[in-house]
Amino acid sequence: MRKQKIFFNSTLPRSGSTLLQNIMGQNPEFHVTPTSGLIDLMLGARIGYNQNHESKAGDTEMWKEGFYKFCKEGIKGYVSSQTTKPYYLDKNRVWAFYYNLLSNIVENPKVLYMVRDLPSIFASMEKKFRLNPDKDDGTMDNIKLKGTSTHKRVELWAQTHPIGYSLEKLQQTLLDGTAKNFLFIRYEDLCNNPENVMKSIYQYLEVDDFKHDFQHISQVTVENDAIHGIYGDHIIRNSLNMLPNDSRDVLGQYTVDSIKTSYKWYNDFFGYK
């Protein structure tokens, strides 16, 4: 069996990570995952490593080397237990934020990072909120006047998981330089120019190119969206196309302008106007 390679999909929320997984899944060389808990096994091992009193009393460098090799072999074993395919694309948005740790475990880790026009991300959240008036997920509190308007909900999401956390950590990767190791993919570019985007992905991964069918994308990842609450939506459309940007209609011009002002760094770096 050929040596297996693991790659990472660490995408912003509501930015097409599941779509990308299923496009990549057309390639018979690739095993693609739904939202994965593999990173939690690595981080769980790190908790044990840091809290272990015996390691602190012994040769700390030996324990450190052992921890990294433990994680490395554990990831290899995990991947080989899931598939015999040579390439494994694991999806979890926080991989990028642990790049320095990951790079001590996986040689030259390759991270695909999809981004999207920020008002569209927030609008996607708001639409999910409106679609579920029977559910109370804690977003809105009429007593405390929390989340009682679209603008307030956007402000709340900007300060909490998953959007606020992801944007804060993304900005940190740009600051500390780890982002230079990622391949950033704009969702809009994938929809409008998929052939070129996929070519750039294969070049970055150093894998042979593959001809994809963007009008017949089968759903190969399976996910229980109930686990993710009202915002869970991991069902893809089977043909790739760019839907009209409705963020102004959903959020209002004032909130769209506020998002763009607050995240100027994001728009400047990724070329959004």
Model-based region annotation:
Residues 91, 102-128:
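Conserved phosphate-donor/acceptor-positioning beta-strand/loop module used by diverse small-molecule
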Residues 65-81, 123-204, 263-265:
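PAPS-dependent sulfotransferase catalytic domain
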Residues 1-76, 82:
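PAPS-dependent sulfotransferase catalytic core
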Residues 18-21, 39-42, 96-98, 119-124, ...:
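Short catalytic/ligand-binding loop motif for oxyanion handling, primarily in non-cytosolic enzymes
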Residues 16-30, 102-106, 184-209:
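PAPS/PAP-binding and catalytic site of the sulfotransferase fold
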Residues 10, 90-92, 115-116, 187:
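Short His-Asn-centered micro-motif
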Residues 1-7, 159, 167, 171-175, ...:
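PAPS-dependent sulfotransferases, especially Golgi type II membrane carbohydrate sulfotransferases
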Residues 71-101:
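Glycine-rich phosphate-binding loop used to anchor ATP phosphates in small-molecule kinases
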